[in-house]
Amino acid sequence: MSQPIVVAALYKFVTLEDYVELRDPLLKAMTDNGVKGTLLLANEGINGTVSATREGIDALLAWLRNDPRLVDVDHKESYCDEQPFYRTKVKLKKEIVTLGVPGVDPNKAVGTYVDPKDWNALISDPEVLLIDTRNDYEVAIGTFKGAIDPKTETFREFPDYIKANFDPSKHKKVAMFCTGGIRCEKASSYMLGEGFEAVYHLKGGILKYFEEVAQEESLWDGDCFVFDNRVTVRHDLSEGEYDQCHACRHPIDVKDRESEHYSPGVSCPHCWDTLSEKTRRSAIDRQKQIELAKARNQPHPIGYNYKAEA
């Protein structure tokens, strides 16, 4: 029986003034250990999801933690039978998760971390405003019971949503969550800057909650979107049954795949009537290349349009 692939989502907000110089040695550490996936580097820290054998992930984590600034880098693990990534990349960015608000710095101020074991009690408090900081297509397939959906298409829209809908003088307690902890951590820094006083966020995100909270005690409803080819995971961290539309990135279920508007790699019921003819032709050509690569047992020549958590 083949060894399962370990998928590690990791991040840390920490000042990395030499992040440009870190790119090449980090990429070498990944390739030397057979690690695939994408890591983002910025002055504010590191973020991304990678996958490899147990030995490969352990070797990469050891390499990262050899740097005193990354010795406590946060990471969550899950497993799958096949490699969920096709390439190995290290990208340089202005932000490791893009909020687009100058001055927001989680290295200087963040909300209160809440461990998964204490999360249920917090969000069961009727005075706590519970906000899902993820994008609309993620929220659509699963969220915590009673959570507010901002209906944002990107994290950049989150600040405008907060300004339009909430008042620090009226909303005294705010709790936020996201997939792995990074977006809600940065959101908490933003909220404090806007004058909100009691700001909480789920430490380690939904994935750590799944890992540490028993399913029979869970307040989660649905699957959780992940940023790799598994698309979603269940509460037990096993791979879900969703696919993802390559055109619009929206998760698609069995009902979507049975729709007359679904064409593998080209369109789905969520986007079929919004695609230009040029985009449709490009998607058809891309799908042909992907199917040809699969038939030859080769990595996809173009790959899926997956991005690091954004």
UniProtKB/Swiss-Prot annotation:
Gene Ontology process terms (BP): tRNA modification
This protein's UniProt keywords: Oxidoreductase, tRNA processing
Active-site residue list: C178
Cited InterPro entries: Rhodanese-like_dom, Rhodanese-like_dom_sf, TrhO, TRHO_N
Superkingdom assignment: Bacteria
Top enzyme class: oxidoreductase
GO molecular function: oxidoreductase activity, acting on paired donors, with incorporation or reduction of molecular oxygen
Reaction catalyzed: uridine(34) in tRNA + AH2 + O2 = 5-hydroxyuridine(34) in tRNA + A + H2O
Matches recorded under PROSITE patterns: RHODANESE_3
Entry EC number(s): 1.14.-.-
Sequence ranges assigned to domain Rhodanese in this UniProt record: 124-218
HAMAP family per record: TrhO (MF_00469)
NCBIfam families reported for this sequence: PRK00142.1-4 (NF001136)
Function: Catalyzes oxygen-dependent 5-hydroxyuridine (ho5U) modification at position 34 in tRNAs.
Family assignment from sequence similarity: Belongs to the TrhO family.
Official protein name in the record: tRNA uridine(34) hydroxylase
Native source organism of the sequence: Pseudomonas entomophila (strain L48)
